[in-house]
Amino acid sequence: AIHRQTLQALQQAQPTGHWVLKSPNHLWCLPALLEAYPDARIIWTHRDPAKVLPSLASLNCAMQMQFTRQLEPERVGNYWADKIERAITRAALFDSERQPGWCYHLQYKEFIADPASALATIYANFDVPMTELHAQRISAWLSQRPQHADGVHAYDPADFGWSNGSLQQRFSQYQQRYAVPIEG
């Protein structure tokens, strides 16, 4: 209840017909999320953990540097690798216990390759009509915000004591189960 009330308070100035919650943090609590929002439409985006984890660890290190001079990147990285591994394991178990179609599994690579088409597929999957106006707005938004227009987030897995191979080995079951391609 408090989650819903918080969202309602946040949107008070601009009411909307639905919310879009974008966070891997929801992987830890899918049962509670669906209990609170039984009509939720879940999109689980799958991406190579060897790309996700160094980025996540780098962002968390940048935030922590604001508060400490004793930053330990390997410790931060291992914390997040453990946390994401538990989240994926928990979410995959939940996924295996649900009926097919309870969520839409989206490959990040497919989304990046053609975002408008991926969104149209998602809408169709959930039987939500996409109006021509909506499609035009999506197209306009995408053309005004090309990927990497504001720069590229640079990071190196080695900064956190990893190699791409070590992360791919650690998350191989996830990548096999959901056909998550290894990114170059």
Residue ranges of model-derived segments:
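Flexible, glycine/threonine-enriched loop-and-boundary segments that flank and lead into catalytic domains
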Residues: T6, Q11-D39
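Short, flexible loop/turn elements at secondary-structure junctions
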Residues: S23-L27, P49, E110
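Conserved phosphate-donor/acceptor-positioning beta-strand/loop module used by diverse small-molecule
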Residues: K22, L33-S58
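Active-site-proximal structural scaffolding
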Residues: S23-H26, E35-P38, T45, I84-A87, ...
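PAPS-dependent sulfotransferases, especially Golgi type II membrane carbohydrate sulfotransferases
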Residues: A1-Q14, H18-W19, L53-H105, K109-G184
